[in-house]
UniProtKB/Swiss-Prot annotation:
Protein name: Alpha-conotoxin-like Pu1.2
Keyword line: Acetylcholine receptor inhibiting toxin, Amidation, Disulfide bond, G-protein coupled receptor impairing toxin, Ion channel impairing toxin, Neurotoxin, Postsynaptic neurotoxin, Secreted, Toxin
Consequence of changing C25S: In [C4S]Pu1.2(1-9); no loss of HVA calcium currents inhibition in rat DRG neurons (this effect could be blocked by the selective GABA(B) receptor antagonist CGP55845) and no inhibition of human alpha-7/CHRNA7 and alpha-9-alpha-10/CHRNA9-CHRNA10 AChR
Organism from which the protein derives: Conus pulicarius (Flea-bitten cone)
Top-level taxon of the source organism: Eukaryota
Residue(s) carrying Cysteine amide: C37
Domain notes: The cysteine framework is I (CC-C-C). Alpha4/6 pattern.
Disulfide bonds: C24-C30, C25-C37
Function comment: Alpha-conotoxins act on postsynaptic membranes, they bind to the nicotinic acetylcholine receptors (nAChR) and thus inhibit them. This toxin also inhibits high voltage-activated (HVA) calcium channel currents in rat DRG neurons (27% inhibition at 1 uM toxin) probably by activating GABA(B) receptors (GABBR1 and/or GABBR2).
Gene Ontology molecular function terms on file: acetylcholine receptor inhibitor activity; ion channel regulator activity; toxin activity
Family named by the database record: Belongs to the conotoxin A superfamily.
Coiled coil: none
Tissue: Expressed by the venom duct.
Amino acid sequence: LDGRNAAADFETSDLLAMTIRGGCCSYPPCIANNPLCGGKR
């Protein structure tokens, strides 16, 4: 059960990261504030 939960959590966080990259990272102000976008710092 723990293994399945860990896999689900990983998939969820991965999907969330992709959503943030795809949506937030389309907007320069959001890119600047979000390290997931690879913002220049």
